[in-house]
């Protein structure tokens, strides 16, 4: 029975495990350690990963991506005739990762360590654990992504004592943490972040700018727009440290060409960089840590590879940041190391990881009877160490009051209703004059970020509430499980077929004339030989299709302008 580490990412997800003194990444059924966090539905079959990503170029209405950004919300995704929540889509990704891990390790997965953004709130953490439950994965511990990154850094550098600022800039989230490492302890001092800021936002800015410069693209349909977004994203990643890179996009019989430049990215990304500056300052302020007390600034996450972001961080801290090798794999490595610790592997040093509460948790109180809007009374302030428990005393505000309603809120706003309401407790009290009767309210927050609130009145009657933040009922979970089980997760052969078919469909859209007809013929023969069970002929056609894809791609690339 194996324990694995999972980096459930906005753009890509990874699986890792500890073996023979090192952490290893597990390849998926397509041979890659990166599994795109993309889901696509085709009738009663569900595709997850690269095949789903390719289908998204030509079947956008049946495909969903970047749904991690909406964990903890009630957003719905309609894929074909089916409707999914972000939690259900995440469950499908986790199910695929578990299947690939079990196939590779040749043993069942007993448990998973799943990483989450440090700035994930209670709802988002609860939904992540629920997604794991739907995928048939037992999760004892969620760990924050910067904690995992710090663990990977400390293990790689064999560095015991250090104060680190970890900047985790992914596809859809930004986490900034001040981390202190000493002896065998990795202690989070403070976190800040934005759950809706990442590389996807850079992509959107590039897309908007490109569309404004090229009005001839205004009539692009959904699939054409998806193709352009993909081309711009690939160019952004390929730019590296070059000053500029040509983007060439073909739609129908027309081709549009333009450069993307470092200067352009810097100009478009100024609001993002200013947000990063503000969040770095907030984390350091909360940690009571000055710039000269930071030993290293660690950059992880796929979007940390963007050179204009690296330059900004270097200017901000007056030193080059440590950009971890393969930034998009660092968090997964940290999760795998922690999986080894959970397994009590003899060849790994035991480490204790502490976390903090990312948001203030409190209740609603009335300070002034003239003001009918309750204020927030902080109970656990942001960045208090976990686990943490605190008790406060609350009193009635009305004469002969029989009930007290305790709202439970998360956030930093002054007025209670401007924060996120996690739930409420109702508890009876003795009828007395205002202020003469009270209750004791205890907030307890554990290391996994699970909150329990307890209220006790003068008669020692206790009302407990485990906050699960609008989590589904057992009946709703069962209904979701039934829906997901009805969708068939394809085997390796079907997944490979879907990947080739999706690539051929995309190629068909790029071509004209004879080449397009050849691709159409390839699509037809690939489909019919498979459906008719002509195995030997299908294998032959499949290999021909692979060769055709390579040749056609080389032909298209020949028309790309020199940078």
Where are these regions (language model features)?
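Oxyanion-binding/catalytic loops of NTP- or PPi-dependent enzymes
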Residues: 1-73, 77-83, 92, 99-563
């Amino acid at each position: 029975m194996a324990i694995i580490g999972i980096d459930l990412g906005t753009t890509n997800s990874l699986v890792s495990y500890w073996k023979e003194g090192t952490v290893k990444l597990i390849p998926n059924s397509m041979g890659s350690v990166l599994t795109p966090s993309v889901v696509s539905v085709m009738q009663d079959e569900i595709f997850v990963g690269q095949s789903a990503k390719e289908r998204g170029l030509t079947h956008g209405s049946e495909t969903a991506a970047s749904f991690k950004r909406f964990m903890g919300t009630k957003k719905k995704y309609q894929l074909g005739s089916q409707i999914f929540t972000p939690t259900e889509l995440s469950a499908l990704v986790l199910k695929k990762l578990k299947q690939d891990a079990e196939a590779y390790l040749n043993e069942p997965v007993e448990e998973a360590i799943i990483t989450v953004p440090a700035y994930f709130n209670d709802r988002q953490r609860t939904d992540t654990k629920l997604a794991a439950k739907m995928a048939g994965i037992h999760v004892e511990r969620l760990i924050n992504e910067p904690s995992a990154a710090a663990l990977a850094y400390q293990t790689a550098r064999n560095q015991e004592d250090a104060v680190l600022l970890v900047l985790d800039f992914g596809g859809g989230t930004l986490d900034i943490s001040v981390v202190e490492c000493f002896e065998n302890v990795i202690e989070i001092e403070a976190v800040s972040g934005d759950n809706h800021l990442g590389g996807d936002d850079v992509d959107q800015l590039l897309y908007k700018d490109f569309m404004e410069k090229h009005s001839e693209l205004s009539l692009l349909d959904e699939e054409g727009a998806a193709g352009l977004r993909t081309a711009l994203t690939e160019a952004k990643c390929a730019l590296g440290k070059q000053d500029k890179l040509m983007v060439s996009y073909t739609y129908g019989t027309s081709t549009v060409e333009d450069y993307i430049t470092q200067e352009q990215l810097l100009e478009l990304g100024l609001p993002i960089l200013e947000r990063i500056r503000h969040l770095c300052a907030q984390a350091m302020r909360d940690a009571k840590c000055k710039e000269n007390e930071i030993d290293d600034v660690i950059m992880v996450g796929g979007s940390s590879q963007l050179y204009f972001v690296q330059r900004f961080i270097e200017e901000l801290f007056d030193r080059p940041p440590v950009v971890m090798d393969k930034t998009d794999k660092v968090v997964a490595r940290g999760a795998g190391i922690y999986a080894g610790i959970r397994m009590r592997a003899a060849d790994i040093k035991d480490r204790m990881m502490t976390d903090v509460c990312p948001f203030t948790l409190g209740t609603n109180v009335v300070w002034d009877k003239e003001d009918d809007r309750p204020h927030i009374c902080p109970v656990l302030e942001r960045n208090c160490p976990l686990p943490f428990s605190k008790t406060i005393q609350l009193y009635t505000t009305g004469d002969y009051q029989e009930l007290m309603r305790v709202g439970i809120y998360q956030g930093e706003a002054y007025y209670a209703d401007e924060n996120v309401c996690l739930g409420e407790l109702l508890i009876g009290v003795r009828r007395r004059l205002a202020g003469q009767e009270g209750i004791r309210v205890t907030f307890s927050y554990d290391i996994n970020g699970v909150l329990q609130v307890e209220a006790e009145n003068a008669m020692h009657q206790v009302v407990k509430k485990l906050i699960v933040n609008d989590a589904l009922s057992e009946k709703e979970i069962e209904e979701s499980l039934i829906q997901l089980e009805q969708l068939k997760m394809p085997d390796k052969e079907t997944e490979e077929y879907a990947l080739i078919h999706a690539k051929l469909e995309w190629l068909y859209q790029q071509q004209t004339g004879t080449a397009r007809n050849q691709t159409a013929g390839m699509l037809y023969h690939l489909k019919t030989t498979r459906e008719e069970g002509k195995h030997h002929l299908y294998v032959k056609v499949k290999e021909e299709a692979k060769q055709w894809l390579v040749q056609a791609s080389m032909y298209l690339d020949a028309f790309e302008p020199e940078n």
